[in-house]
Regions:
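The feature marks the mature, well-folded catalytic cores of soluble enzymes
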Residues: 2-90, 94-109, 118-151, 169-407
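Long, intrinsically disordered low-complexity tandem-repeat segments
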Residues: 157-163
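Compositionally biased, flexible interaction segments
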Residues: 165-167
Length: 407
C-alpha cells in the first residue's frame, strides 16, 4: 500500500528506460492467419530495440515453436552463457523482477543486423519468460510503471535529494501498476493477458488497481500532465460505474497528475480500441505534442482530425502558454484482404534510449514523417521500422511494446 504522503510520478516515455516489454505472437491467437509475417515483424522490431536497450519477451507456455524460433534467431554460434560474456548489472536486476517459478532464458548480446548502423559493439540482452498469453498487445495489458518518492527520505531542498541519491540513500522506487485489462471493453478474450503482471512479477513490486485502463489510452509528459480522450476512457464496457470526473480523479491520484487533457475528437477507421490516444496525438517533450493530420478533404478522417487539431490548438500549459504542435502526415488508405481499412499511423512511435522508432507502411509519406520527427527531436536517432504486418490486426509499433524503468 502506498502512503498518502508518497509522491507519485508517471514518467515520460523519453526518460531513461530499463527495457521494453513485449509478447510474441503464437498460433492460438488472432495472428494464426498471418503468423509467419507477424513473427518476422516482431523479430525485426526486437533486433532494432536491442541496439539501444534490453527486451523482456513473453512467449506463451504452449508455444514451444515460437520459443525455438526466437532462440535460433538471436543466439550466436558462441553460446550466450559463455564466460567470455559476463552478465551485466541490468541483467541481474531484470531477472530479479520475476517470480522464481517463471521459466526464464537469458540471451546476451543477441544477434542484430542493425547493430553496426548505430555504432554499437554488442547488443543489449534479450530476457525470455514463459507465461500464458492471449495476444501480443503489450502496451495495453502490460504494467504501467510509476516513480514513487517515499516521505521518510524527502528533503525540503531538491539539491539535498540529489545528494542523498548520490550517497546511495535512495528515496525513490519504481512500482508496477496492474490495471484491469478486459479486452478493450469486452471485445476480445483477455483472461491470460489480464493475469500477466501478477503471474510474471514479484508481488511486492506490483500494485493491483481498481479500474480498467489500457496503456495505449493515455500519454504522459512526465511533468504532471496526461493526454487522453473521451471516446476510449468513457466507453461503457470499461468503467461503467465511473463518471468522467471520477475517472479523472483516479488518474490524478494514481499517476500524481496536476491535469488531464481530454480530447473529444479524432479516430482512425479500423482501430478497435475506441480511439487510443497513441494512434492520434503524443507528447514528444513536456511542451510539445505530435499528432496526425489529414489534408485530403475527400478522406473520411478529414473532418474529425481537423476538429481534433482545433482542440489541441486551444490546450494550455500550466504557465498559460499553448503547446507546441508537430503535425504528422497521414498515410494513404491501406486495406486488408477483405477490403477493410487499416489504422496506419505515424503517431504510434516508440521511444527507446537515445532513439525514436517509427512505424512505416511502404507509403510515400514514410520519409516525410521520419524527417519531421527527426527535426523535432534532434537529440534522438529516428529510425523507421516496417509495420505493415502489425496493422493487419489493427495495431502498430507502440501497441506491441511497453517501456519499463529503473532508477
Amino acid at each position: 500500500m502506498v502512503d498518502l504522503t508518497t509522491r507519485v510520478r508517471l514518467k515520460a516515455e523519453w526518460e531513461k528506460q530499463l527495457a521494453i516489454f513485449m509478447a510474441f505472437p503464437h498460433q492460438n491467437s488472432d495472428w494464426t492467419k498471418h503468423i509467419h509475417k507477424a513473427r518476422a515483424c516482431f523479430l525485426d522490431i526486437i533486433e532494432h530495440i536491442v541496439c539501444f536497450e534490453s527486451v523482456i519477451l513473453c512467449i506463451d507456455t504452449q508455444d514451444d515453436e515460437g520459443f525455438e524460433i526466437v532462440k535460433k534467431h538471436f543466439s550466436k554460434a558462441l553460446d550466450s552463457t559463455n564466460a567470455d560474456f559476463m552478465k551485466t548489472q541490468d541483467d541481474e536486476y531484470i531477472k530479479n523482477l520475476f517470480n522464481q517459478s517463471v521459466p526464464y532464458t537469458l540471451i546476451q548480446n543477441p544477434k542484430s543486423k542493425y547493430l553496426a548502423n548505430f555504432g554499437g559493439n554488442s547488443a543489449f540482452s534479450l530476457h525470455i519468460v514463459r507465461v500464458p498469453t492471449n495476444d501480443t498487445w503489450a502496451r495495453d495489458f502490460g504494467a504501467i510503471s510509476v516513480e514513487l518518492e517515499s516521505p521518510q527520505n524527502l528533503a525540503q531542498n531538491p539539491s539535498q535529494n540529489m545528494a542523498q541519491n548520490k550517497a546511495g540513500q535512495r528515496d525513490k522506487q519504481i512500482q508496477l501498476l496492474d490495471f484491469t485489462f478486459n479486452g478493450w471493453g469486452l471485445k476480445y478474450p483477455a483472461f491470460y493477458d489480464n493475469a500477466i503482471t501478477r503471474a510474471l512479477f514479484r508481488p511486492e513490486l506490483t500494485r493491483q488497481m481498481d479500474m480498467v485502463l489500457e496503456g495505449g489510452s493515455i500519454d504522459s509528459n512526465g511533468a504532471g500532465v496526461l493526454l487522453t480522450n473521451t471516446q476510449c476512457l468513457l466507453e461503457f464496457n470499461r468503467n461503467p460505474h465511473l463518471s468522467q470526473v471520477e475517472i479523472e480523479s483516479k488518474l490524478k491520484k494514481y499517476f500524481g497528475l496536476d491535469s488531464v487533457l481530454w480530447l473529444t475528437q479524432g479516430y482512425l477507421v479500423g482501430d478497435d480500441t475506441d480511439s487510443h490516444i497513441d494512434t492520434l496525438a503524443r507528447f514528444i517533450s513536456k511542451d510539445t505534442i505530435a499528432y496526425v493530420k489529414c489534408e485530403d478533404e475527400k478522406d473520411e478522417h478529414f473532418q474529425a482530425l481537423r476538429l481534433m487539431e482545433s482542440e489541441l490548438q486551444v490546450l494550455k500549459q500550466a504557465n498559460g502558454e499553448p503547446y507546441k504542435l508537430v503535425a504528422l502526415p497521414f498515410t494513404r488508405a491501406i486495406f486488408d484482404e477483405n477490403g477493410e481499412r487499416l489504422p496506419a499511423s505515424y503517431a504510434n512511435f516508440l521511444f527507446v534510449n537515445g532513439a525514436l522508432l517509427v512505424p512505416t507502411y511502404d507509403d510515400k509519406n514514410d520519409e516525410k514523417a521520419l524527417k519531421i520527427l527527426a527535426q523535432a527531436l534532434p537529440s534522438h536517432r529516428v529510425v523507421g521500422i516496417d509495420c505493415r504486418s502489425l496493422i493487419l490486426w489493427h495495431g502498430s509499433l507502440h501497441c506491441v511494446t511497453m517501456q519499463m524503468y529503473r532508477l
